[in-house]
Design a protein with these regions (language model features):
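N-terminus-centric sequence/structural signature that marks the extreme N-terminus
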Residues: 1-122
Length: 122
């Protein structure tokens, strides 16, 4: 099971976040990633299940570079959703469920949540 941490606001405690992030190490032994911008911090520890390549590490940025996602869980219908995106001509870079989620969000916004079947958090 992966693990992630997120923080945003005026007074981000970077020392505290680093301690918390390190506590997640056992949750994701395959990769770790951090994304910071202004007053936003996202960190991810990955247990690779789908697409074992580095290209699927998190935090993941959307193709348009507007959105960044950290995700944990399993989307049971992600192959169906992936095919939907491909049929629309979206050129996915990975075979990961994470990219399917973020690109579906780019396309449909929050209403895409009703299309996800599984157990997940992001």
């Amino acid at each position: 099971m992966c693990g992630f941490i997120a923080s945003f606001g005026q007074n981000i405690n970077h020392k505290g976040l680093k301690i918390a992030f390190n506590q997640l190490q056992r949750r994701g032994p395959d990769a770790e990633g951090i994304w910071k911008k202004d007053n936003i911090f996202l960190g991810s520890r990955r247990l690779a299940i789908f697409d074992l390549h580095d290209r699927s590490n998190q935090p993941m940025t959307s193709i348009c570079n507007r959105y960044v996602l950290v995700f944990n869980g399993s989307i049971y219908n992600y192959l169906e959703l992936r095919n939907y995106l491909l049929n629309l001509g979206i050129k996915l870079r990975t075979t990961s469920d994470t990219e399917v989620i973020i690109e579906l969000f780019v396309l449909e916004g929050p209403k895409m949540l009703s299309r996800l079947q599984g157990m997940f958090s992001f």
